[in-house]
Design a protein with these regions (language model features):
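Pore-lining transmembrane helices
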Residues: 1-243
Length: 244
């Protein structure tokens, strides 16, 4: 939005002010207006519908509920679907802490899993992804699911299903083991307030390794794009005028 607004020429006297104030302010107001008066209503309706649907699943059993919550938590890595699942568990942390016992794990397995994947099979990832993997593990430990976004953006068809499967596995284990998380958050940072810490930690490892192994099985080795170009240049160097 700001990039498009910069096409509007301002007087020379306002150019400096435009970059640091006018363009960002107008861009924020326009974007916020679109969300509040445009797409905000439909998105809110969808989220409310998902929340009501989750509430109706209270009697279906722990494994189906854990599977659904785990899949939703990992699906868009901090997006609207993730927020519905996490808020559903967070708002009941006082009465049903076992929900956060599972969701707390599902929150962190996507980034931790992708970080582990880069360590297990570094040839399948480029330099940027390897560096992102180190940061992803740390982000997962403090409950930030968004650490997996760079990997999903580069290869969504292989990464997102792997994140979902790992989160489902990670969510089911605490549900069945009776783990209770008394904090409305996830990751390893909440261990001090978790009842059943060993199972919680096992679930994080299990979900992370399932994600890592699955995504590495699906991905091919990464090939540097410049490799082909370097070969071509070497071939050109070997060409002589005699050959022409």
């Amino acid at each position: 939005m700001v990039k498009e607004l910069k096409r509007i020429k301002l007087p020379i006297s306002l150019k400096t002010l435009g970059s640091i104030f006018i363009y960002p302010l107008v861009g924020t107001l326009v974007t916020g207006g679109i969300i509040v008066w445009g797409i905000g209503g439909p998105i809110a309706a969808i989220m409310n519908g998902l929340t009501n649907w989750l509430s109706s699943l209270g009697d279906v059993g722990k494994v189906p509920l854990a599977s659904i919550l785990g899949a939703m938590t990992a699906f868009d890595m901090g997006g609207p679907v993730n927020k519905v699942a996490t808020l559903f568990a967070q708002t009941q942390v006082d009465t049903l802490p076992y929900l956060m016992g599972g969701v707390g794990v599902a929150i962190c397995t996507p980034p931790i899993g992708m970080g582990i994947a880069t360590l297990l099979a570094p040839k399948k990832y480029n330099v940027e992804e390897k560096e992102a993997g180190k940061a992803a593990i740390l982000m997962g430990c403090v409950g930030i699911t968004e650490g997996a976004i760079p990997f999903a953006a580069n290869d969504p068809l292989r990464v997102i299903p792997s994140l979902i499967v790992g989160a489902v596995v990670g969510n089911i284990i605490p549900f069945l083991a009776g783990v209770l998380n008394h904090a409305p958050w996830g990751g390893l940072i909440v261990l001090p307030v978790v009842e059943g810490r060993i199972w919680y930690f096992i679930a994080v490892l299990a979900g992370g390794f399932v994600t890592a192994l699955m995504v590495n099985l699906l991905k091919k080795n990464y090939v540097e794009e410049s490799a082909g170009n370097d070969t071509d240049l070497d071939d050109l160097d070997e060409i002589t005028f005699d050959e022409l």
